[in-house]
Amino acid sequence: MAGDSEQTLQNHQQPNGGEPFLIGVSGGTASGKSSVCAKIVQLLGQNEVDYHQKQVVILSQDSFYRVLTSEQKAKALKGQFNFDHPDAFDNELIFKTLKEITEGKTVQIPVYDFVSHSRKEETVTIYPADVVLFEGILAFYSQEVRDLFQMKLFVDTDADTRLSRRVLRDISERGRDLEQILSQYITFVKPAFEEFCLPTKKYADVIIPRGADNLVAINLIVQHIQDILNGGLSKRQTNGYLNGYTPSRKRQASESSSRPH
């Protein structure tokens, strides 16, 4: 894992023109995506930096759930709405936001309330940063979004661990009861993971087993990001193979006609 990851990371270099370096982080529900991102930020010493000065920021796909109709919200409150389907997300807004980030613009991120299943009126302001981590269960599903990432990480955690984490999270943070959580998992979450999320694992440049517990993989990624922040990497290679690996943009060209399921 360590050797392969290190060689792969060497091929993902800072984009031309000093644009923000976008990293996509995908994986199943409660796989540890947020924890991996938080660990990266912590190891970079960015977790207590003033938001105006942050070099590394984290965005969540969960912020971009679509505004539900009254009928959809009623289903959601009963645990009968599929939040793990690609159509549950505002993919146009995700692409627009990430595109503006690559252009160095300040963006406004929606705030989603998981208790009321609605988008709040306030937004979160994200200022230009050198590195942006975008995490979500379907971060790699849309090709136009996927193609914006210079690096793609997949957090690979076993199903039992993910389910136990989801139960604890949804009870403590989202006010759900156990019966509703398990029903939703069996009806929507597990089938959607197998149909929409798991097939996108093939797009990952680095797979991280055990999530935030895998410090070997995370330290390699952190070192790579540190090199970017310190200007230690040369401009991105775009002409063929590098150290025996194909740069991600070259691979993505061959992925264009494929669908993740």
From Swiss-Prot:
A biological-process GO annotation: feeding behavior
Domain of life: Eukaryota
Pathways per UniProt: Pyrimidine metabolism; CTP biosynthesis via salvage pathway; CTP from cytidine: step 1/3; Pyrimidine metabolism; UMP biosynthesis via salvage pathway; UMP from uridine: step 1/1
CDD domains: UMPK
GO molecular-function term, one example from the UniProt record: uridine kinase activity
Documented EC number(s): 2.7.1.48
Modified residues (N-acetylalanine): 2
Oligomer status and interactors: Homotetramer.
NCBIfam families: PRK05480.1 (NF004018), udk (TIGR00235)
Function description: Phosphorylates uridine and cytidine to uridine monophosphate and cytidine monophosphate. Does not phosphorylate deoxyribonucleosides or purine ribonucleosides. Can use ATP or GTP as a phosphate donor.
Name of the molecule in the record: Uridine-cytidine kinase 2
Source organism of the structure: Rattus norvegicus
